[in-house]
Amino acid sequence: MGRTTKVGSAGRFGPRYGLKIRRRVAAVEARMKQKHVCPVCGRKAVRRISTGIWQCQKCGATFAGGAYLPTTPAGKVAKRVTASKA
């Protein structure tokens, strides 16, 4: 196993790809693995099931979102536009 103190979960790549890339991967994975707010019940219990599929552990709501985060910047813009038109 490689040294992981600097890059955490990206230590699995060993010395490959450079430190900057591995730090970036570790930051994305850390944000992905934390619990997120459910759009249905509002609880902080949403976990990623697979790429782009998210599920709330509390209410069981399953929805599509971004690959690494349940809401993407483009999704936020689209939601804001549809809310202003309604």
Curated annotation (Swiss-Prot):
Question: For this chain's UniProt record, which GO biological process terms are given?
Answer: translation
Q: Which GO terms describe its cellular component?
A: ribonucleoprotein complex; ribosome
- Please name the Pfam families in this protein's record: Ribosomal_L37ae
Q: Which UniProt keywords apply?
A: Metal-binding, Ribonucleoprotein, Ribosomal protein, RNA-binding, Zinc, Zinc-finger
Give a GO molecular function annotation for the protein: zinc ion binding
* Family the entry assigns: Belongs to the eukaryotic ribosomal protein eL43 family.
Designated name of the protein: Large ribosomal subunit protein eL43
Q: Which gene encodes it?
A: rpl37ae
